[in-house]
Amino acid sequence: MNLVFSFDEGYAEVFKVLLHSLYLNNKETRFNIYLLHDEMLSEALEDLQRHIEYYKYNFFPIDCRKYLEESENFRINRYYTIEMYLWLFAPYLLPKEVDRALYLDADIVNMNSVKDFYSQDFEDRLFVAMDYKIKNQIIQPFNNLRLRTKDADNYFNTGIVLMNIQKLREERTAKEISEAVVDNKAILILPDQDVFNYLYHDEIKENSWEIYNVDPRLYQVFQLINPETYNLGWVEDEVVFIHFAGKHKPWVEREKYKWDLGKYYFEFEKMLMDTYTERESDRIDGRTF
């Protein structure tokens, strides 16, 4: 199973929590981890490799600098870096034998098996993604005007995206992504997400955000309205991914993080920390990980 990530050194520790949650909920799966990066420090890559190989997964870091010679044109403002765009180029950067891949933001935890989501039929679409309709419906006309997608009914989130790599290679190009970024720089608000919707809005299969891309803020609203359905038992039994989108992050705010689903980040983080203790004991005993 092919997983694609794109982040800088600042998100390495958060990624490790996601990785541990994937391991715990997919024990029978061996992941190929592709990290698209922009000249990440060798020490950081070596550290990631040790952690990934602990789970017996394959790690393939891909330095994308040479593919983005005019990368300064991609920078929107100080909050967004080139790594935000790299996943869009995955079809043209991954090995030719890869025919599908799941892109994940690092600010996620996995709650249940990803097998069904990953192996689903694309139904001749380029992607599978989720739209927070309840949040986006008010601003959909504005997004359509801004991105010139007048017929679009959706504005898809790009935190979790299943990619039809083979079809993308056959039908689309990397050049159109670069041109979309540079030509629309003045109107991009959520850069990679805007470009994704601008280019592909009518070629995306929609899945339910309530299962595959739960936003803790929206969950809190639904839980207040219908607590019999939306509760932590439902989250633990049904939800596949919790996505800590937005500016407020549990690993930054710690005990001040106010959304209930932050508890799962802290639980997976603690379980990861416990493995560090075990690994250190193994090292002292002469075993390696």
Model-inferred region functions:
Residues 108-142:
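Conserved donor-nucleotide/metal-binding helix-loop-beta segment in metal-dependent transferases, i.e.
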Residues 1, 7, 14-17, 165-289:
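A glycosyltransferase accessory/donor-loop signature
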Residues 32-39, 129-131:
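Short internal beta-strands
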Residues 50-93:
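Active-site-proximal specificity loops/subdomain of glycosyltransferases
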Residues 21-29:
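Short, acidic, metal-binding catalytic loop of nucleotide-sugar glycosyltransferases
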Residues 101:
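Short aromatic/hydrophobic "clamp" motif used to bind/position activated sugar donors
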Residues 149-160:
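A recurrent flexible, glycine/aromatic-enriched loop bordering the glycosyltransferase active site
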Residues 104:
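Catalytic metal- and UDP-sugar-binding loop of GT-A-like glycosyltransferases, i.e.
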